[in-house]
Design a protein with these regions (language model features):
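Short, well-formed alpha-helical segments that are part of the catalytic scaffolds
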Residues: 11-25
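A conserved acidic beta->alpha catalytic loop
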Residues: 22, 37-46, 67-68
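Short beta-strand/loop segment that forms part of the nucleotide-sugar
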Residues: 31-39, 60-65, 89-90
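Glycine-rich, basic loop-to-helix element that forms the pyrophosphate-binding segment
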Residues: 64-80
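Short aromatic/hydrophobic "clamp" motif used to bind/position activated sugar donors
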Residues: 85
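Donor-binding/catalytic cores of nucleotide-activated saccharide
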Residues: 90-199, 207-210, 214-220
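Catalytic core of nucleotide-sugar-dependent glycosyltransferases
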Residues: 206-212, 218-247, 258-292
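Membrane-interface aromatic/basic loop that binds lipid-linked glycans or pyrophosphate carriers
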Residues: 269-339
Length: 339
């Protein structure tokens, strides 16, 4: 079997049928679909079961208690039987010619990985690599992949990667990282990119990503921060390996600082957020950074003047000022949006 299409499923009853239909209508047919239901509380599991009964030779399903998408992905990997794996999120869908296009590249180049573009609801095309046109990237040229992966430039999505299963470590126990609920794609991709020797890039959009609001950040801002902290530590390990004497280390720290400010902004903007809870959250981050001073030492280059200002207020411990300034900026943005 050539392809295993892996779907982590959780509460996607509105979209899972469209997702599965887009795979079942592929022009290339040597594939299996592996669905891992992460304890859905809606009708997602029931809908998936109905498809499995209709296509038992193609679809396999694992139902389990909720443990988060990272551990769900690990189960899907262990269930996969295809020579190559690719991911499809349960609320997204793929273009009808994706598998055929991947097959042609495998026949021609037998790569360890194929990367392609995706679109969002806005019909905006996101280029996974900042390279014009199709290309083959050999091991000696992988620094371009490393930089774009670590600096967060549209390459962190698992859903735009077709990966040779033999280069993926499926046996390592990830249970210690079950708290990683944000950025799990990047967490999974780092060792895979490291192991890939030949990578094909297709400058075509084969994947449609639906923007669905999530409550992960809003329900537990510190969990969001904890995820980013773990991912940053993993990034730093690979950065040391890939660029032992390179200044890119500071750029990665800038990306991490931006993620942390994102968490603080989301926390402050959460509905019915009490100031007391917000202050507790920010102080927890500061306590953590006191123990791990990578973020708090030195100036960071953040993507906007507003975020630079947030960052300075955070470092100076002006937590209340930061809270009210975030609220003010959000109100101004909302007014502009409704004009």
């Amino acid at each position: 079997m050539l392809f295993s299409v892996l779907i982590p499923l959780y509460n996607a009853e509105k979209y899972i049928s469209e997702c599965l239909d887009s795979i079942l209508c592929q022009s290339f047919h040597d594939y299996e679909i592996v669905i891992v239901d992460d304890g859905s509380t809606d009708n997602s599991g029931f809908i998936a079961d109905s498809y499995q009964k209709k296509y038992p030779e193609v679809i396999r399903i694992v139902h389990k208690k909720n443990s988060g998408v990272l551990l769900t992905r690990r189960i899907a990997l262990r269930e996969a039987k295809g020579d190559y794996i690719l991911w499809v999120d349960s609320d997204d869908f793929i273009k009808p010619n994706l598998l055929q296009s991947l097959f042609e590249q495998i026949q021609s180049h037998a790569p360890d990985m194929i990367i392609y573009n995706y679109e969002e609801d806005s019909e905006k095309v996101f280029h996974s690599l900042l390279i014009p046109g199709d290309c083959i990237i050999e091991k000696s040229q992988k620094d371009i992949l490393y930089r774009q992966l670590l600096l967060g430039r549209n390459m962190n999505e698992l859903c735009t990667k077709c990966i040779k299963r033999s280069i993926v470590d499926v046996n390592t126990d990830y249970s210690a990282f079950s708290h990683v609920r944000m950025g799990d794609d990047l967490f999974c991709l780092l060792p895979i990119i490291d192991a890939a020797n030949t990578v094909v890039y297709l400058d075509h959009s084969f994947y449609w990503s639906r923007v669905v609001s999530t409550s992960i950040i809003h329900t537990n801002s510190f969990r969001c921060y904890s995820s980013y902290r773990t991912i940053f530590e993993r990034e730093d390990q690979y950065l040391e390996k890939w660029f032992p004497e390179n200044s890119d280390r500071n750029a990665v720290r800038d990306v991490f600082a931006n993620r942390v400010i994102d968490c603080i902004v989301q926390c402050a903007n959460t509905r019915k957020m009490r100031i007391k809870d917000y202050l507790t959250f920010v102080r927890k981050i500061r306590e953590d950074e006191t123990k791990n001073p990578i973020f708090s030492k030195g100036n960071r280059k953040l993507p906007s003047l507003v975020y630079q200002f947030y960052y300075r207020l955070f470092l100076k411990k002006h937590d209340l000022r930061l809270f009210y300034f975030i609220k003010f900026v959000s109100c101004i943005s909302a007014i502009k949006h409704h004009k």
